[in-house]
């Protein structure tokens, strides 16, 4: 029986790191990427203390089409298939619309939206050919509820939800399931304020890995995940 193979983007810290941890605990191999080589190396050292043979990583700019294609091609060459893709890589710039630079807008869209498109497009043919696979796009409740100063971030997450829904319709007939996770406030370095009420990265990771337990006939195409007590 073949190993369960997963790819996680933005996997060196925060939600992505929690997803990598959770997938490794389930068994199988995990390939993750992040933009910073230093961040990748640090996470890989820590993870290999417990999982020396089952986790692999590269520094990849998901907004670079050629880097994404090379990364996925290498995984497919090594493993022959990909069972699960988690598109988690993301950045944020927050400023009033008239103070948001074009450069910041483009960089954010390149990472948050283009990167997810490139990754899905790269894994889809192999998943379709195999007749199964799971793609999870980590969006945000900010993709449904705009916030002041969040023009670029909101737009990227609205776009990611739309992209995810369309990909779901494209791929479901071939046994490939596409789901969007919409977390509320999560306690990560990305978050601007602390708070015990916030979701933890492990909460999001548990939701994502839980999708692997659904029968093939069931497709949770969107999941909204909120803190219980307050906030979004």
Place the predicted regions along the sequence by residue.
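C-terminal helical subdomain
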Residues: 173-176, 180-181, 195-232
């Amino acid at each position: 029986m073949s190993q369960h193979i997963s790819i996680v983007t933005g996997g060196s810290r925060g939600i992505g790191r929690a997803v990598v941890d959770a997938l490794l605990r389930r068994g199988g191999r995990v390939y993750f990427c992040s933009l910073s080589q230093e961040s990748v190396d640090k996470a890989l050292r820590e993870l290999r203390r417990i999982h020396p043979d089952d986790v692999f990583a590269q520094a990849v700019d998901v907004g670079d089409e050629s880097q994404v294609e090379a990364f996925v091609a290498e995984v497919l060459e090594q493993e022959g298939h990909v069972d699960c893709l988690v598109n988690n890589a993301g950045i944020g710039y927050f400023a009033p619309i008239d103070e948001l630079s074009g450069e910041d807008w483009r960089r954010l869209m390149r990472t948050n939206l283009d990167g997810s498109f490139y990754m899905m497009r790269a894994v889809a043919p192999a998943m379709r050919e195999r007749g199964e696979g799971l793609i999870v796009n980590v969006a945000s409740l900010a993709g449904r509820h705009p916030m002041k100063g969040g023009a670029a971030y909101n737009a990227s997450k609205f776009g990611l939800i739309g992209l995810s829904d369309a990909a779901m319709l494209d791929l479901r007939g071939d046994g490939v399931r596409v789901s969007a996770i919409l977390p509320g406030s999560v306690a990560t370095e990305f978050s601007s304020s602390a708070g015990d009420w916030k979701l933890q990265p492990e909460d999001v990771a548990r939701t994502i890995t839980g999708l692997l337990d659904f029968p093939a006939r069931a497709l949770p195409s969107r999941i909204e995940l909120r803190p219980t007590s307050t906030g979004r």
